Amino acid sequence: MNNVSENLTVILPKKQLHLFGYEYYFNSFIKLYQKYILPNVILLSGPNGSGKATFAYHFINYLLSYNEKDKYSVNDFTINPENKSYKYLCDNTHPNFSLLENDELSENIKKDNVRNTLKFLNKSTYFSDIKIVLIDNVEYLNVHSSNALLKVLEETNNKTFFFVIHNNSCKILNTIKSRCVEFKLFFTLSEKIKILKNIIKQYKDNFKIETIDECFYFFLRITSTSRRAP
């Protein structure tokens, strides 16, 4: 148990190369996008630690890398680490992507953060003609930042996509929710076990997991952090 704790290195959602358990949702989003009916403001709602951010980053990579070398693989739902957009996203430097979240010194997403998103939307695009905004932990919006965000959402065009991540144990303002198309992400117990096994395989080279207790301790550690490190 102690060895697991000491050697554990959590892979951030934006750096996860493999996507497990979201194949149905991913294929559904692809069909909507190819038919030009993918909602521009998508609310991903589900339990904390269920992989919503990882799913969002994978689909964002699919969109941004579509015409690039080493593009996203829809055959096995993996990101190529040599892909240009993946590298930019990992460094938070992709010109067509903006992350809106609370900063380290505050539990709230501030109005100034939303203003920065607006500035991003007013800039020209590069590499592709779409822009993407990921709003992590939307429940951290306060009244002022929510009002500012509403104005941004009202001006969204068909080349801009918002992925809004919501921990469904927390409440969000109805005014924000009403601007989104909500996708409630849910997994059965058997699906969760399958996902867990795949995640553990991903870490097998880091350390050896021998007992069931260690497996579940491992699972709790990698899914318990609500903040996404930069």
Task: Tell me what each language-model feature is.
Residues M1-I135, F161-F163:
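P-loop/Walker A NTP-binding region and its immediately flanking N-terminal helices
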